[in-house]
């Protein structure tokens, strides 16, 4: 196993906009896509239907040079879709049930994770709404022992307090937004008006290496296990299209930084910069390597 091959687990789907345009998405897919652009060749574990959308995903991954070893085909369930509406530049999601990514089968990837070493396992909270995919993730964690980057993506109604708490307890690094931080605080019985102090409490409760909190146009901050606080300044978006996938770009650069031993302040600044670039395109993925070169030139 190559030293810097992260394992990315979870949904791949199509974001369908009001004008009926559709673009590939899903936080784990977006993160894997960006990491491929950054040269890490991630091992992406997901599931698509045996349908036209599934074929489009497979072809898109091939064209980008991504590995297909962990992508399963499903004859019974469709490739995931999400209806996206944009209000004041912010996306709202209608996430459909019983999608292929809900049924990721561990037996299909068992030989790819047993006795294998991965430096990092990324996952979110949506793809584990269903017991089958949830159990597959559990087995991956057991078999690999990889350190976990948890991306909190609260999407109604596909979450529960128990689900979020269990994933936090197994995580090493966590990324969430300010609203999700407040929700975690409610779940854990924490309270504080100051976001920084609240994040420090959550970091301590779950023994995290660090917690990243994104603040939209106000930037982001990291608090680590030693209560060291780093803040980033916001980056202007010249031509805002939408914010779909901006957080996923942020996560990908954060993971790249972790695997390259960047200081927390460096992670923040570069992740915020890259997320701002995502806000200038429709959808969540880029086909232009120049965007990634901005990060790689300083790696």
Over which residues does each language-model region extend?
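Conserved phosphate-binding/catalytic region of the ribokinase-like
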Residues: 1-4, 192-299
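Hydrophobic/aromatic residues located in beta-strands of well-ordered beta-sheets
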Residues: 42-44, 148, 211
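Conserved beta-alpha-beta core of the PfkB/ribokinase-like small-molecule kinase fold
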Residues: 120, 124-197, 219
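Structural alpha-helical scaffold elements that stabilize or flank donor/cofactor-binding regions
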Residues: 6, 113-114, 166-167, 204
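Glycine-rich phosphate/adenosyl-contacting loop at the front of the ribokinase-like
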Residues: 1-67, 240
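Conserved N-terminal subdomain of the carbohydrate kinase-like
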Residues: 41-125, 296-299
């Amino acid at each position: 196993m190559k030293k810097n091959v992260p394992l990315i687990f979870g949904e791949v789907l199509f974001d369908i906009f009001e004008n009926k345009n559709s673009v590939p998405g899903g936080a784990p897919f977006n993160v894997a896509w960006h990491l491929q652009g950054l040269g890490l060749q991630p091992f992406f574990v997901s599931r698509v239907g045996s349908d036209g959308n599934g074929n489009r995903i497979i072809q898109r991954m091939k064209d980008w040079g991504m590995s297909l070893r962990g992508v399963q085909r499903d004859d019974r369930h469709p490739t995931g879709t999400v209806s996206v509406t944009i209000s004041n530049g912010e996306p709202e999601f209608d996430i459909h049930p019983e999608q292929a990514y809900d049924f990721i089968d561990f037996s299909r990837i068992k030989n790819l994770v047993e006795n294998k070493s991965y430096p990092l396992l990324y996952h979110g909270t949506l793809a584990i709404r269903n017991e089958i995919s949830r159990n597959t993730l559990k087995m991956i964690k057991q078999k690999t022992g990889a350190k976990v980057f948890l991306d909190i993506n609260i999407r109604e109604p596909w979450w529960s307090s128990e689900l979020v708490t269990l994933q936090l307890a197994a995580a090493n690094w966590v990324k969430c937004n300010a609203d999700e931080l407040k929700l975690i605080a409610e779940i854990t019985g924490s309270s504080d008006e100051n976001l920084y102090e609240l994040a420090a409490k959550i970091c301590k409760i779950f023994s995290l290496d660090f917690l990243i909190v994104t603040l939209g146009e106000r930037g982001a901050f990291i608090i680590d296990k030693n209560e060291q606080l780093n803040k980033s300044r916001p980056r202007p978006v010249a031509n805002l299209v939408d914010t779909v996938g901006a957080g996923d770009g942020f996560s990908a650069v954060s993971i790249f930084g972790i695997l390259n031993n960047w200081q927390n302040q460096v992670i923040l600044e570069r992740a915020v910069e890259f997320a701002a670039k995502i806000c200038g395109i429709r959808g969540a993925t880029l086909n232009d390597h120049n965007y990634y070169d901005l990060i790689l030139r300083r790696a």
